[in-house]
Amino acid sequence: ALSDLSSVVSYKDIYESVTSLNLSIYTPSLFIFDSKREKYMGTSHNKGNMTQSGRERGVRKLMSINLLKRLESSVNSFVLTLSRIKELIDHTIQTIDHFKRNGLTKLDMYDVSENDFDIDDTNNDFVVGKKVQIDLADVDIKSWREELAADSENIGILLFMLKEVTPKHDKKLQTLLEMINNKITNPINPNNKKIIIFSAFADTAMYLYDNIAPYVQEKFGLH
């Protein structure tokens, strides 16, 4: 379970929500009108002969997988990534709406945060690269906006349901604190007071430190 609170969404429900996301925020080139595709054929920031649309599909797949990795790492990391994705989606929707009112607008086709990927994924060809711009006049903005809005709504619901999972109700964190308490109370080596915890994500490591450090200092006088 994610939390000791029975009202909190389950891992199964989160998995189903994540895998049902369109994540079309990362695939704008799929919505380019056929008549305009040639204009972007040479547009790429890739290695080898990977097309922009191919790269975008790769990023979308990586992000979907990585969201689940983030959840496995900590609910805190998962919420941070979901919030960043929603912010990007909402900004893009605002840009589309601005275009509908005022006309010409260019939009960055590519925007991912390396903080949301583990070390292995940041070395992937899909992630490394610079932004490329797309003219919204060349895009089926109606279809794209519909998918973006659906994702924004679903992510918003997920974030709302996860608000209750504070550190006090984070079951994974509380289980870790119990393990630390047991190790310190019943040490194999009484002279070894170090606590070493590994994580693939820097923000998970910081989240754990921020919650473990005051706990062991208050309870055991350790720094």
Locate the predicted segments by residue.
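Helicase motor interdomain insertion/brace
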Residues: A1-H223
